[in-house]
């Protein structure tokens, strides 16, 4: 039987950070993953450029049934700490927008940096390795694996959620949590495109590929970014963000004119452009195709001077408060994250250690902590991995 001090299951962002940090403080660390490569999600993230953190990270950027849980870890390993690591390795990066930091070159720069740190600190990495059984024993945990029997003092679960199963996502971490008496909060896809009802399919299909700056709202949350029409429904940053707050049957409200008071703008057009058709004026804000389709779907296009006060009010309402009830989401297949997971009320916010089973730790996406779009989920991976590594 092989013995080590720390076994980390899951060689993604959180697992790699935990491994290199624990090994860096002198712990003997074994990092295990069932995949044939480490950090697959890192490689595909950010369109291949890895949005590795956000300069404006704060606890308000995270969803959890236990809102205060993430505060301690985020304060002890900040975005600036990770940016310092990136700078130390000479990885060039830039801010794209809204504090989102991306590699100048490719995501493999970030993965390479983490793997280099693991090599330097002496982490033992084992890929293509499956866990068959875990048992609590005196002084730690015993694992039956395809490598043989392992024994460790500390066991860290960094297996992620259910999103993007083609990259190897499974519910393994949730099974371990249940085995050791933890409550699981219901899981669902987050940061995911919406599918739409039949009556909207024609409009979305016709506008497929069109991107529009909007204010999207649901359940007292709002995001101002682009939406993207697709053949399947609605996507784009604003839709992905609001999807984490949406539940089946909820109404989503889209303001297509976020820079204007729609009613005032329409009245202004009646004065300044009385002979212009509304679709022509909207064509200066949206694409001409979108303006024409909105005219066909929502109102009769005619010279501005011909609209009554009631018609102007009705059009303003549609443009500033387009209400729709999505049919659903595209699910885990395309979701960037998994909402829900291991109930954080049963985990120490300081150490990430289980309050049910000493020596067992949970980090990253397996926990009920989900960030907004824009590098926040990676920052949670770095911060939670670092926190556990101080104690594991």
Regions found by a protein language model. Give the residues of each.
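N-terminal Rossmann-like FAD-binding beta1-loop-alpha1 element of flavoenzymes
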Residues: 4-31, 388-392
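Short hydrophobic core segments
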Residues: 7-9, 32, 131, 150-166, ...
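Glycine-rich FAD pyrophosphate-binding loop
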Residues: 23-47
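An anion/pyrophosphate-binding glycine-rich loop and adjacent beta-alpha core
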Residues: 36-38, 43-44, 52-59, 92, ...
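Glycine-rich active-site loop/strand segments that organize a redox cofactor
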Residues: 49-95
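Feature captures the FAD/FMN-dependent oxidoreductase FAD-binding
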Residues: 76-154
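A glycine-rich dinucleotide-binding beta-alpha-beta segment and adjacent secondary-structure elements
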Residues: 127, 292-370
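Glycine-rich loop(s) and the adjacent beta-strand/alpha-helix scaffold that form part
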Residues: 154-197
């Amino acid at each position: 039987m092989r013995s080590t001090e720390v076994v980390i299951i899951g060689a993604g962002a959180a697992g790699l950070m935990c491994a290199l940090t624990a090994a860096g403080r002198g712990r003997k660390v074994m990092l295990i993953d069932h995949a044939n490569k480490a950090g697959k999600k890192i490689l595909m993230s950010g369109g291949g450029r890895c949005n590795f953190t956000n300069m404006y990270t704060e606890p308000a950027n995270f969803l959890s049934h236990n809102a205060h849980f993430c505060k301690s870890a985020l304060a002890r390993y900040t975005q600036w700490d990770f940016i310092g690591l990136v700078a130390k390795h000479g990885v060039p990066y830039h801010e794209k927008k809204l504090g989102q930091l991306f590699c100048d070159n490719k995501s493999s720069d970030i993965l390479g940096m983490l793997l280099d740190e693991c090599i330097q600190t002496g982490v033992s990495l084992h890929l293509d390795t499956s866990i068959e059984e875990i048992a609590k024993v005196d002084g730690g945990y015993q694992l039956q694996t395809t490598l043989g029997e392992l024994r460790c003092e500390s066991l860290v679960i960094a297996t992620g959620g259910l999103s993007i199963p083609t990259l190897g996502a499974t519910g393994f971490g949730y099974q371990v949590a249940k085995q050791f008496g933890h409550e699981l909060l219901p899981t669902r896809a987050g940061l995911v495109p919406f599918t739409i009802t039949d009556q909207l399919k024609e409009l979305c299909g016709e506008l497929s590929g069109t991107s529009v700056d909007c204010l999207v709202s649901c359940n007292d949350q709002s995001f101002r970014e682009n939406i993207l029409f697709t053949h399947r429904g609605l996507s784009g940053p604003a839709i992905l963000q609001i999807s984490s707050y949406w539940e089946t049957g909820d109404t989503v409200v889209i303001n297509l004119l976020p820079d204007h008071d729609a009613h005032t703008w329409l009245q202004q057009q009646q004065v300044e452009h009385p002979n212009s058709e509304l679709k022509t004026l909207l064509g200066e804000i949206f694409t001409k195709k979108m303006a024409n389709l909105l005219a066909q779907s929502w109102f009769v296009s005619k010279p501005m001077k011909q609209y009554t006060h009631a018609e102007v009010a009705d059009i303003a309402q549609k443009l500033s408060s387009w209400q729709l009830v999505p049919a659903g989401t595209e699910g885990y297949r395309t979701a960037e994250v998994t909402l829900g997971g291991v109930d954080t009320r049963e985990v120490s916010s300081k150490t990430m250690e289980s309050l049910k089973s000493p020596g067992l730790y949970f980090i990253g996406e397996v926990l009920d902590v989900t960030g907004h779009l824009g590098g926040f989920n990676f920052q949670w991976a770095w911060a939670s991995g670092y926190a556990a590594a101080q104690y594991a």
